[in-house]
Amino acid sequence: MTASELLDLAWSYPLFEALYGRRSRRFGLGFEMPEGPFRYKSAHTPVPLSEIEEALLVGAGAGFSGLALWDLPTPAPYRRRSGRTFPTTRPGGHTALFFTNDEGLYVLDANVAASKLREIETPDERTKVLEAYRAQRRELRRGRLDIPRHILPMSGHDLWDSNRPGSTLFLPVCDVSASLISLIAQFVDPALRRYAPAGGGMNIVDDRHGCRPAGTERWLKDGFLDAERMLPLSIVERQACYYVFSEPATICQNMFLATEALGLGGWKHCGFLSLEILERMGFRIVAANGGATFGNPVGLDGVFEASCPPYCPTMDAAVDAVFSQTPREATAPVPYRMSDGEHRVGAIRISPEGLACTKAICNYIHDTYGRFPGGTDAMHLMWVMQAHHIDTDYYDRFFGPGAYGPAHAAHMATWHP
């Protein structure tokens, strides 16, 4: 089959068939389960995923789907409005997709501008998935990422099958720092019309230090913040994590459903010490200080960097970067029929007092805890998704009909004739 025919085949797979057929199929070609009731050694050699298979998985998990609508009464003035195949609280998202296979370690370039409302509208445009994969894939190093095969960083029940030859392991890494800065501003500044009541912003207090003001004394005194509306800092940081953690989870689930459509095996897993994996990926770990127990993974230089020092000289600069109002290119496409002038009428922007208060809180966190965020890491690797070719002999031996579907049965003949 041609690439176009394979794309059409993947596109035609029914969504609800994928939802109800989805299973964790952990045993791949060339794998060995050394113990237990399903002890088995594959008689086949591993077969790596093809370029088009990886492209479809990447496109399903973290593809750029077109212009985000932002159909809100108070639209945000984002320069880019690129929608993704996963839901996110800002265009482009807070998550970078890394992946490793037998050939190397890669990252998907997220600096992509949407060209129209729906990037893929016709069958002829489905080749964009493959074109985007080729254009956005950036090689970071040669060879498979070496993840130590012991507890931790791996879970004990995944030692035998995770990151094996022939597999592709997808590692979505999310950034909490920018989310936290944005969320702090939304809690303190009524001008943003999010979580700060019109009568005064929330009084963010440090509940890990006796509920003292988190650097906000000036704004409490002048009434910009409502002293009676106390909000613990730990809850704000937790909420910032909630905002972001849904992204990698959805990326993995999208890929999981795509494996069903393509007839591949795989599963989403976690339960590891991500700090060690991030370090092996080349992430910068800022040494613990100010009472912190562990170092803070803040980014991969020049690839994916948190909104905090050392990538920003100060927390003031980090806040400014998050709220920088870079004008949208005059020729950039928009999803709406109205003029840009009409659209800007409802746009919201942080107020000068809100910006100053946000900076004060962020500086308090960094100065008090020696890191930003204070109670969690800047970068997180919560889940990974592995895809591989299943060994149907294994499933035929141990399981009844239905252990895998028609797409799995026909996969090698269809995709690797």
Q: What is each model feature region?
A:
Residues 1-417:
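Acidic, surface-exposed loops and disordered segments
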